[in-house]
Amino acid sequence: MMITLSFAPSRFVRRLSLGAALSAGLVITAMTPAEAAKTTLNLGMSVEPTGLDPTIAAPVAIGQVTWQNVFEGLVTIDQAGKIQPQLAKSWEISADGLTYTFKLQTGVKFHDGEAFDAASAKFSLDRARGAESVNPQKRFFASIASIDTPDAETLVLHLSAPTGSLIYWLGWPASVMVAPKTAADGKTTPVGTGPFKFASWAKGDKVELARNADYWNKDAAAKLDKVTFRFIADPQAQAAALKSGDLDAFPEFAAPELMSSFDGDARLVTRIGNTELKVVAGMNTAKKPFDDKRVRQALMMAIDRKTVIDGAWSGLGTPIGSHYTPNDPGYRDMTGVLPYDVEKAKALLAEAGYPNGFTFTIKSPQMAYAPRSAQVMQAMFAEIGVTMNIEPTEFPAKWVQDIMKDRNFDMTIVAHAEPLDIDIYARDPYYFNYKNPPFNALMKKVQETVDPATQNAIYGEAQKILAEDVPALYLFVMPKLGVWDKKLKGLWENEPIPSNVLSGVSWDE
Protein backbone atom coordinates (compact mmCIF):
# COMPACT_ATOMS: atom_id res chain seq x y z
CA MET A 1 0.00 0.00 0.00
CA MET A 2 1.30 3.44 -0.90
CA ILE A 3 0.96 6.31 1.55
CA THR A 4 0.98 9.82 0.08
CA LEU A 5 1.82 12.81 2.24
CA SER A 6 1.39 16.27 0.71
CA PHE A 7 1.99 19.68 2.10
CA ALA A 8 0.89 23.30 1.73
CA PRO A 9 0.70 24.93 -1.71
CA SER A 10 3.86 26.49 -3.16
CA ARG A 11 4.41 30.23 -3.05
CA PHE A 12 2.07 32.32 -5.14
CA VAL A 13 3.86 33.80 -8.17
CA ARG A 14 2.29 36.93 -9.60
CA ARG A 15 2.09 37.32 -13.35
CA LEU A 16 1.17 40.31 -15.39
CA SER A 17 -2.17 39.99 -17.10
CA LEU A 18 -2.19 40.33 -20.86
CA GLY A 19 -4.09 43.59 -20.57
CA ALA A 20 -1.67 45.08 -18.11
CA ALA A 21 1.26 44.06 -20.26
CA LEU A 22 -0.24 45.64 -23.36
CA SER A 23 -1.14 48.81 -21.50
CA ALA A 24 2.48 49.05 -20.47
CA GLY A 25 3.47 48.99 -24.13
CA LEU A 26 4.99 45.52 -24.07
CA VAL A 27 4.84 43.17 -27.03
CA ILE A 28 4.45 39.58 -25.87
CA THR A 29 5.60 36.92 -28.32
CA ALA A 30 6.37 34.07 -25.94
CA MET A 31 6.64 33.19 -22.28
CA THR A 32 8.99 35.41 -20.32
CA PRO A 33 12.13 33.75 -18.93
CA ALA A 34 10.62 33.73 -15.45
CA GLU A 35 7.60 31.86 -16.78
CA ALA A 36 9.40 29.45 -19.11
CA ALA A 37 8.92 25.82 -18.24
CA LYS A 38 11.90 24.36 -16.41
CA THR A 39 13.68 21.64 -18.40
CA THR A 40 16.48 20.53 -16.06
CA LEU A 41 16.44 18.16 -13.11
CA ASN A 42 18.90 17.71 -10.24
CA LEU A 43 18.33 14.28 -8.71
CA GLY A 44 20.09 12.81 -5.69
CA MET A 45 21.38 9.28 -5.12
CA SER A 46 23.02 7.78 -2.02
CA VAL A 47 25.47 5.53 -3.84
CA GLU A 48 27.59 6.39 -6.86
CA PRO A 49 27.70 3.58 -9.44
CA THR A 50 31.01 1.87 -10.09
CA GLY A 51 30.30 2.02 -13.81
CA LEU A 52 27.46 2.85 -16.17
CA ASP A 53 26.92 -0.43 -18.04
CA PRO A 54 24.34 -2.69 -16.33
CA THR A 55 25.34 -5.61 -18.54
CA ILE A 56 28.75 -6.02 -16.89
CA ALA A 57 28.16 -5.36 -13.17
CA ALA A 58 25.40 -5.92 -10.63
CA PRO A 59 25.16 -2.85 -8.32
CA VAL A 60 21.68 -1.38 -8.65
CA ALA A 61 23.02 2.19 -8.81
CA ILE A 62 24.10 1.49 -12.39
CA GLY A 63 20.57 0.80 -13.54
CA GLN A 64 19.24 3.68 -11.46
CA VAL A 65 21.20 6.03 -13.72
CA THR A 66 21.08 4.31 -17.11
CA TRP A 67 18.16 1.84 -17.36
CA GLN A 68 15.35 3.28 -19.50
CA ASN A 69 17.28 6.55 -19.71
CA VAL A 70 20.36 5.63 -21.75
CA PHE A 71 19.69 1.93 -22.35
CA GLU A 72 16.57 0.06 -23.45
CA GLY A 73 15.70 -3.61 -23.90
CA LEU A 74 13.69 -5.74 -26.25
CA VAL A 75 10.95 -5.39 -23.63
CA THR A 76 10.62 -3.27 -20.53
CA ILE A 77 8.95 -3.45 -17.12
CA ASP A 78 6.49 -0.69 -16.28
CA GLN A 79 5.71 0.91 -12.92
CA ALA A 80 3.07 -1.74 -12.25
CA GLY A 81 5.67 -4.49 -12.79
CA LYS A 82 4.12 -5.55 -16.10
CA ILE A 83 6.02 -6.49 -19.24
CA GLN A 84 5.67 -4.02 -22.12
CA PRO A 85 7.08 -4.02 -25.68
CA GLN A 86 10.04 -1.76 -26.32
CA LEU A 87 12.69 -2.35 -29.00
CA ALA A 88 10.71 -5.47 -29.88
CA LYS A 89 7.23 -4.38 -30.91
CA SER A 90 5.83 -7.92 -30.71
CA TRP A 91 6.81 -11.55 -30.15
CA GLU A 92 5.52 -15.07 -30.53
CA ILE A 93 6.38 -18.18 -28.52
CA SER A 94 6.10 -21.61 -30.09
CA ALA A 95 3.77 -24.19 -28.57
CA ASP A 96 6.70 -26.18 -27.17
CA GLY A 97 8.19 -23.05 -25.60
CA LEU A 98 11.48 -23.48 -27.44
CA THR A 99 11.30 -20.76 -30.10
CA TYR A 100 10.82 -17.04 -29.48
CA THR A 101 10.32 -14.83 -32.54
CA PHE A 102 10.62 -11.07 -32.05
CA LYS A 103 9.56 -8.39 -34.51
CA LEU A 104 11.74 -5.34 -33.94
CA GLN A 105 11.06 -1.63 -34.16
CA THR A 106 12.34 0.07 -37.31
CA GLY A 107 14.18 3.35 -37.66
CA VAL A 108 15.93 3.03 -34.29
CA LYS A 109 19.48 4.31 -33.91
CA PHE A 110 21.99 4.07 -31.11
CA HIS A 111 23.36 7.35 -29.79
CA ASP A 112 26.52 6.83 -31.87
CA GLY A 113 24.44 6.75 -35.07
CA GLU A 114 24.63 2.99 -35.55
CA ALA A 115 21.34 1.35 -36.51
CA PHE A 116 19.59 -0.94 -34.07
CA ASP A 117 18.44 -4.07 -35.87
CA ALA A 118 18.38 -7.84 -35.56
CA ALA A 119 22.17 -8.03 -35.95
CA SER A 120 22.83 -5.66 -33.05
CA ALA A 121 20.21 -7.42 -30.93
CA LYS A 122 21.96 -10.73 -31.63
CA PHE A 123 25.30 -9.12 -30.73
CA SER A 124 23.90 -7.91 -27.40
CA LEU A 125 22.50 -11.31 -26.43
CA ASP A 126 25.57 -13.22 -27.64
CA ARG A 127 27.73 -10.87 -25.58
CA ALA A 128 25.54 -11.50 -22.53
CA ARG A 129 25.55 -15.30 -22.86
CA GLY A 130 29.00 -15.99 -24.30
CA ALA A 131 31.86 -17.81 -22.62
CA GLU A 132 33.62 -14.52 -21.83
CA SER A 133 30.49 -12.83 -20.51
CA VAL A 134 30.67 -11.03 -17.18
CA ASN A 135 26.97 -10.22 -17.24
CA PRO A 136 25.69 -10.27 -13.62
CA GLN A 137 22.59 -12.17 -14.75
CA LYS A 138 24.29 -14.50 -17.22
CA ARG A 139 22.00 -17.30 -16.09
CA PHE A 140 19.10 -15.49 -17.79
CA PHE A 141 20.52 -16.45 -21.14
CA ALA A 142 21.73 -19.98 -20.37
CA SER A 143 18.87 -21.69 -22.20
CA ILE A 144 19.46 -19.80 -25.47
CA ALA A 145 21.01 -22.42 -27.74
CA SER A 146 21.22 -20.30 -30.89
CA ILE A 147 20.02 -17.03 -32.41
CA ASP A 148 18.85 -16.44 -35.98
CA THR A 149 18.32 -13.14 -37.81
CA PRO A 150 16.20 -13.93 -40.91
CA ASP A 151 16.04 -10.21 -41.71
CA ALA A 152 16.86 -6.87 -40.10
CA GLU A 153 13.51 -6.74 -38.31
CA THR A 154 13.30 -10.33 -37.05
CA LEU A 155 15.16 -11.97 -34.17
CA VAL A 156 14.64 -15.67 -33.41
CA LEU A 157 15.83 -17.31 -30.18
CA HIS A 158 16.08 -21.10 -30.12
CA LEU A 159 16.10 -22.51 -26.58
CA SER A 160 17.50 -25.76 -25.25
CA ALA A 161 14.70 -25.96 -22.66
CA PRO A 162 11.52 -24.03 -21.89
CA THR A 163 12.24 -20.91 -19.84
CA GLY A 164 9.06 -19.46 -18.41
CA SER A 165 10.70 -16.28 -17.10
CA LEU A 166 12.65 -15.39 -20.24
CA ILE A 167 10.45 -12.53 -21.44
CA TYR A 168 10.41 -11.03 -17.95
CA TRP A 169 14.18 -11.35 -17.66
CA LEU A 170 14.65 -9.62 -21.01
CA GLY A 171 13.16 -6.51 -19.40
CA TRP A 172 15.87 -6.28 -16.73
CA PRO A 173 18.79 -3.82 -16.82
CA ALA A 174 21.23 -6.68 -17.45
CA SER A 175 19.40 -7.47 -20.70
CA VAL A 176 19.58 -4.07 -22.41
CA MET A 177 20.72 -3.66 -25.99
CA VAL A 178 24.21 -2.25 -26.53
CA ALA A 179 25.84 -0.71 -29.60
CA PRO A 180 28.34 -3.19 -31.11
CA LYS A 181 30.96 -0.58 -32.01
CA THR A 182 31.04 1.08 -28.59
CA ALA A 183 29.98 -1.66 -26.18
CA ALA A 184 33.51 -2.14 -24.85
CA ASP A 185 33.50 1.42 -23.51
CA GLY A 186 30.07 1.23 -21.88
CA LYS A 187 31.41 1.26 -18.33
CA THR A 188 32.48 4.90 -18.66
CA THR A 189 30.75 6.19 -21.82
CA PRO A 190 27.49 4.27 -22.26
CA VAL A 191 25.77 4.28 -25.64
CA GLY A 192 22.20 3.06 -25.95
CA THR A 193 18.97 3.82 -27.79
CA GLY A 194 17.19 5.62 -24.95
CA PRO A 195 15.58 9.04 -24.58
CA PHE A 196 18.71 10.45 -22.93
CA LYS A 197 22.34 10.44 -24.03
CA PHE A 198 25.29 10.20 -21.69
CA ALA A 199 26.93 13.63 -21.38
CA SER A 200 29.55 13.50 -18.61
CA TRP A 201 30.70 11.88 -15.39
CA ALA A 202 32.60 13.78 -12.71
CA LYS A 203 33.51 10.88 -10.45
CA GLY A 204 32.71 11.43 -6.83
CA ASP A 205 30.19 14.11 -7.72
CA LYS A 206 27.73 13.68 -10.59
CA VAL A 207 26.64 12.11 -13.87
CA GLU A 208 24.91 14.24 -16.49
CA LEU A 209 22.51 13.05 -19.19
CA ALA A 210 21.18 15.13 -22.10
CA ARG A 211 17.95 14.74 -24.06
CA ASN A 212 18.24 12.59 -27.17
CA ALA A 213 16.74 14.84 -29.85
CA ASP A 214 16.70 11.94 -32.31
CA TYR A 215 14.90 9.47 -30.05
CA TRP A 216 12.95 6.91 -32.06
CA ASN A 217 9.79 6.80 -29.92
CA LYS A 218 8.24 10.25 -30.22
CA ASP A 219 5.40 9.25 -27.87
CA ALA A 220 7.91 8.68 -25.07
CA ALA A 221 10.46 11.40 -25.88
CA ALA A 222 12.14 13.10 -22.93
CA LYS A 223 10.56 16.32 -21.73
CA LEU A 224 13.69 17.36 -19.83
CA ASP A 225 16.75 18.74 -21.62
CA LYS A 226 19.27 17.78 -18.94
CA VAL A 227 19.34 15.51 -15.90
CA THR A 228 22.09 15.64 -13.29
CA PHE A 229 22.51 12.75 -10.85
CA ARG A 230 24.24 14.01 -7.71
CA PHE A 231 25.83 11.48 -5.33
CA ILE A 232 25.39 12.31 -1.63
CA ALA A 233 25.95 9.54 0.92
CA ASP A 234 25.23 11.40 4.17
CA PRO A 235 21.49 11.53 5.00
CA GLN A 236 21.76 14.91 6.72
CA ALA A 237 23.47 16.33 3.65
CA GLN A 238 20.75 14.81 1.47
CA ALA A 239 18.06 16.58 3.48
CA ALA A 240 19.97 19.86 3.44
CA ALA A 241 20.43 19.73 -0.34
CA LEU A 242 16.71 19.16 -0.81
CA LYS A 243 15.67 21.97 1.53
CA SER A 244 18.10 24.45 -0.01
CA GLY A 245 16.90 23.70 -3.53
CA ASP A 246 20.26 22.31 -4.67
CA LEU A 247 18.37 19.08 -5.37
CA ASP A 248 14.94 18.82 -6.96
CA ALA A 249 14.37 15.20 -6.01
CA PHE A 250 15.72 12.30 -3.97
CA PRO A 251 13.66 9.28 -5.11
CA GLU A 252 15.52 6.89 -2.76
CA PHE A 253 15.91 9.01 0.36
CA ALA A 254 18.17 7.22 2.82
CA ALA A 255 16.95 8.50 6.18
CA PRO A 256 13.45 7.50 7.27
CA GLU A 257 13.93 9.29 10.59
CA LEU A 258 14.25 12.58 8.67
CA MET A 259 11.09 12.21 6.61
CA SER A 260 9.05 14.18 9.13
CA SER A 261 11.50 17.09 8.82
CA PHE A 262 9.82 17.93 5.51
CA ASP A 263 6.44 18.41 7.18
CA GLY A 264 5.10 21.82 6.29
CA ASP A 265 7.67 22.46 3.57
CA ALA A 266 6.03 24.67 0.95
CA ARG A 267 8.04 23.22 -1.95
CA LEU A 268 8.61 19.55 -1.21
CA VAL A 269 6.38 16.50 -1.04
CA THR A 270 7.12 13.03 0.35
CA ARG A 271 6.07 9.66 -1.02
CA ILE A 272 6.18 6.20 0.52
CA GLY A 273 5.84 3.36 -1.98
CA ASN A 274 6.74 -0.27 -2.62
CA THR A 275 10.05 -1.84 -3.62
CA GLU A 276 11.63 -5.25 -4.07
CA LEU A 277 14.37 -4.42 -1.53
CA LYS A 278 14.60 -7.50 0.67
CA VAL A 279 16.91 -6.91 3.64
CA VAL A 280 18.52 -10.23 4.52
CA ALA A 281 21.48 -11.31 6.63
CA GLY A 282 23.12 -13.98 4.52
CA MET A 283 25.28 -16.65 6.14
CA ASN A 284 28.22 -18.54 4.72
CA THR A 285 26.64 -21.97 5.04
CA ALA A 286 29.91 -23.68 4.13
CA LYS A 287 31.48 -22.52 7.42
CA LYS A 288 30.87 -23.72 10.95
CA PRO A 289 28.61 -23.14 12.76
CA PHE A 290 26.43 -21.88 9.90
CA ASP A 291 26.56 -25.26 8.17
CA ASP A 292 24.15 -26.49 10.87
CA LYS A 293 20.51 -25.68 10.16
CA ARG A 294 19.73 -25.64 13.88
CA VAL A 295 22.17 -22.77 14.42
CA ARG A 296 20.66 -20.80 11.56
CA GLN A 297 17.17 -21.44 12.91
CA ALA A 298 18.24 -20.35 16.39
CA LEU A 299 19.57 -17.05 15.05
CA MET A 300 16.34 -16.48 13.14
CA MET A 301 14.24 -17.15 16.23
CA ALA A 302 16.37 -14.74 18.27
CA ILE A 303 15.23 -11.88 16.03
CA ASP A 304 12.12 -9.81 16.58
CA ARG A 305 11.58 -8.41 13.08
CA LYS A 306 9.38 -5.55 14.27
CA THR A 307 12.11 -4.34 16.59
CA VAL A 308 14.60 -4.48 13.73
CA ILE A 309 12.29 -2.41 11.52
CA ASP A 310 11.68 0.09 14.31
CA GLY A 311 15.35 0.45 15.12
CA ALA A 312 16.76 0.38 11.61
CA TRP A 313 14.11 2.09 9.52
CA SER A 314 11.83 4.05 11.86
CA GLY A 315 9.10 1.44 11.68
CA LEU A 316 8.79 1.73 7.89
CA GLY A 317 9.01 -1.74 6.41
CA THR A 318 7.26 -5.07 5.99
CA PRO A 319 8.50 -8.20 7.84
CA ILE A 320 9.34 -11.20 5.64
CA GLY A 321 10.02 -14.83 6.48
CA SER A 322 11.52 -15.88 3.15
CA HIS A 323 13.22 -14.34 0.12
CA TYR A 324 10.01 -12.97 -1.40
CA THR A 325 8.01 -9.75 -1.16
CA PRO A 326 4.25 -9.26 -0.77
CA ASN A 327 4.31 -7.43 -4.12
CA ASP A 328 5.15 -10.59 -6.05
CA PRO A 329 2.77 -13.22 -7.44
CA GLY A 330 2.63 -16.37 -5.34
CA TYR A 331 3.69 -14.65 -2.11
CA ARG A 332 3.12 -16.54 1.14
CA ASP A 333 3.60 -15.06 4.59
CA MET A 334 6.36 -17.17 6.15
CA THR A 335 7.08 -15.01 9.19
CA GLY A 336 5.37 -17.58 11.43
CA VAL A 337 7.62 -20.49 10.41
CA LEU A 338 10.44 -19.46 12.77
CA PRO A 339 8.88 -16.76 14.98
CA TYR A 340 10.66 -14.75 17.63
CA ASP A 341 11.22 -17.10 20.59
CA VAL A 342 14.33 -16.61 22.72
CA GLU A 343 13.94 -19.80 24.77
CA LYS A 344 13.44 -21.96 21.68
CA ALA A 345 16.48 -20.30 20.11
CA LYS A 346 18.60 -21.19 23.16
CA ALA A 347 17.36 -24.78 23.04
CA LEU A 348 18.27 -25.10 19.36
CA LEU A 349 21.78 -23.80 20.04
CA ALA A 350 22.25 -26.30 22.87
CA GLU A 351 20.99 -29.10 20.65
CA ALA A 352 23.51 -28.09 17.99
CA GLY A 353 26.35 -28.22 20.54
CA TYR A 354 26.61 -24.52 21.41
CA PRO A 355 24.99 -24.22 24.87
CA ASN A 356 27.24 -21.26 25.67
CA GLY A 357 26.84 -19.61 22.29
CA PHE A 358 29.68 -18.63 19.94
CA THR A 359 31.32 -15.56 18.41
CA PHE A 360 31.26 -14.44 14.79
CA THR A 361 31.57 -11.33 12.60
CA ILE A 362 29.04 -9.68 10.32
CA LYS A 363 30.40 -7.61 7.43
CA SER A 364 28.10 -4.61 7.12
CA PRO A 365 28.14 -2.24 4.13
CA GLN A 366 27.79 1.47 4.80
CA MET A 367 24.20 1.94 3.58
CA ALA A 368 22.22 3.16 6.60
CA TYR A 369 19.85 0.19 6.88
CA ALA A 370 22.76 -2.27 7.20
CA PRO A 371 24.68 -1.05 10.30
CA ARG A 372 21.44 -0.05 12.00
CA SER A 373 19.92 -3.50 11.48
CA ALA A 374 23.18 -5.13 12.55
CA GLN A 375 23.25 -3.19 15.81
CA VAL A 376 19.72 -4.29 16.70
CA MET A 377 20.56 -7.90 15.82
CA GLN A 378 23.74 -7.71 17.89
CA ALA A 379 21.73 -6.93 21.02
CA MET A 380 19.22 -9.70 20.28
CA PHE A 381 21.90 -12.32 19.70
CA ALA A 382 23.49 -11.40 23.02
CA GLU A 383 20.28 -12.57 24.71
CA ILE A 384 20.95 -16.12 23.50
CA GLY A 385 24.67 -16.01 24.36
CA VAL A 386 25.92 -15.27 20.84
CA THR A 387 28.46 -12.49 20.31
CA MET A 388 28.32 -10.77 16.92
CA ASN A 389 31.09 -8.35 16.00
CA ILE A 390 30.27 -5.74 13.35
CA GLU A 391 32.88 -5.02 10.68
CA PRO A 392 32.11 -2.00 8.45
CA THR A 393 32.70 -3.05 4.84
CA GLU A 394 32.79 -0.52 2.00
CA PHE A 395 30.19 -1.14 -0.68
CA PRO A 396 30.47 -2.01 -3.47
CA ALA A 397 34.19 -2.62 -4.04
CA LYS A 398 35.34 -4.31 -0.80
CA TRP A 399 31.98 -5.96 -0.18
CA VAL A 400 31.94 -7.52 -3.64
CA GLN A 401 35.53 -8.72 -3.24
CA ASP A 402 35.09 -10.18 0.25
CA ILE A 403 31.59 -11.61 -0.10
CA MET A 404 30.88 -12.35 -3.75
CA LYS A 405 34.36 -13.26 -4.93
CA ASP A 406 36.43 -14.51 -1.99
CA ARG A 407 33.57 -15.85 0.21
CA ASN A 408 35.59 -14.45 3.11
CA PHE A 409 32.83 -13.84 5.64
CA ASP A 410 30.66 -15.40 8.34
CA MET A 411 27.55 -13.27 7.82
CA THR A 412 26.71 -10.15 5.86
CA ILE A 413 23.65 -7.96 5.48
CA VAL A 414 22.38 -6.43 2.25
CA ALA A 415 19.16 -5.48 0.50
CA HIS A 416 18.54 -7.67 -2.53
CA ALA A 417 16.82 -5.38 -5.02
CA GLU A 418 15.96 -7.61 -7.96
CA PRO A 419 12.35 -8.76 -8.34
CA LEU A 420 11.51 -12.46 -8.15
CA ASP A 421 15.14 -13.38 -7.48
CA ILE A 422 14.45 -16.33 -5.19
CA ASP A 423 16.40 -18.49 -7.65
CA ILE A 424 19.69 -17.01 -6.41
CA TYR A 425 19.74 -19.80 -3.81
CA ALA A 426 20.05 -22.30 -6.65
CA ARG A 427 23.07 -20.56 -8.12
CA ASP A 428 26.41 -22.31 -7.82
CA PRO A 429 28.51 -20.51 -6.90
CA TYR A 430 26.76 -17.78 -4.94
CA TYR A 431 27.79 -16.12 -1.72
CA PHE A 432 25.54 -18.15 0.61
CA ASN A 433 27.33 -21.36 -0.52
CA TYR A 434 23.90 -22.93 -0.15
CA LYS A 435 23.29 -26.44 -1.50
CA ASN A 436 19.75 -27.80 -1.57
CA PRO A 437 18.90 -30.20 -4.45
CA PRO A 438 15.12 -30.19 -3.80
CA PHE A 439 15.12 -26.40 -3.94
CA ASN A 440 17.18 -26.44 -7.13
CA ALA A 441 14.69 -28.87 -8.65
CA LEU A 442 11.86 -26.44 -7.93
CA MET A 443 13.73 -23.61 -9.62
CA LYS A 444 14.20 -25.80 -12.68
CA LYS A 445 10.56 -26.86 -12.64
CA VAL A 446 9.23 -23.30 -12.46
CA GLN A 447 10.92 -22.49 -15.76
CA GLU A 448 9.25 -25.40 -17.51
CA THR A 449 5.86 -23.69 -17.49
CA VAL A 450 4.42 -20.32 -18.44
CA ASP A 451 1.18 -20.96 -16.52
CA PRO A 452 1.00 -18.34 -13.72
CA ALA A 453 -0.97 -20.55 -11.31
CA THR A 454 1.54 -23.39 -11.66
CA GLN A 455 4.47 -21.01 -11.24
CA ASN A 456 2.91 -19.43 -8.15
CA ALA A 457 2.39 -22.83 -6.53
CA ILE A 458 6.03 -23.74 -7.16
CA TYR A 459 7.23 -20.42 -5.79
CA GLY A 460 5.14 -21.08 -2.69
CA GLU A 461 6.95 -24.38 -2.10
CA ALA A 462 10.30 -22.67 -2.60
CA GLN A 463 9.47 -19.95 -0.08
CA LYS A 464 8.64 -22.60 2.51
CA ILE A 465 11.95 -24.42 2.00
CA LEU A 466 13.94 -21.23 2.56
CA ALA A 467 11.82 -20.22 5.56
CA GLU A 468 12.62 -23.54 7.25
CA ASP A 469 16.23 -23.92 6.12
CA VAL A 470 17.21 -20.23 6.57
CA PRO A 471 20.40 -19.85 4.53
CA ALA A 472 19.79 -16.17 5.30
CA LEU A 473 17.99 -14.36 8.09
CA TYR A 474 14.93 -12.81 6.45
CA LEU A 475 14.23 -9.41 7.98
CA PHE A 476 12.08 -6.93 6.07
CA VAL A 477 11.19 -5.25 2.78
CA MET A 478 12.23 -1.62 2.64
CA PRO A 479 9.72 0.92 1.33
CA LYS A 480 10.57 3.45 -1.35
CA LEU A 481 11.03 6.77 0.43
CA GLY A 482 10.88 9.66 -2.00
CA VAL A 483 11.21 13.39 -1.50
CA TRP A 484 10.83 15.79 -4.40
CA ASP A 485 9.56 19.14 -5.59
CA LYS A 486 5.77 19.09 -5.73
CA LYS A 487 5.87 20.60 -9.23
CA LEU A 488 7.65 17.52 -10.58
CA LYS A 489 5.39 15.10 -12.42
CA GLY A 490 6.07 11.57 -13.58
CA LEU A 491 8.55 10.19 -11.04
CA TRP A 492 7.79 6.59 -10.10
CA GLU A 493 6.28 6.29 -6.64
CA ASN A 494 6.65 2.49 -6.57
CA GLU A 495 9.72 0.58 -7.69
CA PRO A 496 9.12 -2.87 -9.21
CA ILE A 497 12.72 -2.76 -10.41
CA PRO A 498 15.56 -0.48 -9.21
CA SER A 499 15.36 2.55 -11.48
CA ASN A 500 14.87 6.25 -12.06
CA VAL A 501 12.80 6.24 -15.25
CA LEU A 502 12.83 9.85 -16.43
CA SER A 503 11.35 10.00 -19.93
CA GLY A 504 7.93 10.88 -18.53
CA VAL A 505 9.17 13.40 -15.97
CA SER A 506 8.36 17.08 -16.40
CA TRP A 507 7.77 20.28 -14.46
CA ASP A 508 4.24 21.48 -13.91
CA GLU A 509 4.69 25.23 -13.91
Indicate where each model-derived feature is located.
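A structural "hinge/loop" feature
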Residues: 47-64, 87-88, 114, 136-137, ...
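Detector for C-terminal structural segments
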Residues: 38-42, 202, 206, 211, ...
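N-terminal lobe/hinge region of extracytoplasmic solute-binding protein
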Residues: 44-95, 126, 191-192
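Ligand-site clamp/hinge motif
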Residues: 184, 214-260, 378, 387
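Aromatic- and charge-enriched surface segment that lines or borders ligand/interaction sites
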Residues: 89-134, 150, 156, 289
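Surface-exposed binding/hinge segments that line
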Residues: 103, 137-179, 200
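Alpha-helical secondary-structure segments
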Residues: 42, 117-124, 154-158, 194-195, ...
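Gly/Pro-rich hinge or "lid" segments in bacterial periplasmic/extracellular proteins
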Residues: 82, 163, 168-222, 226-228, ...
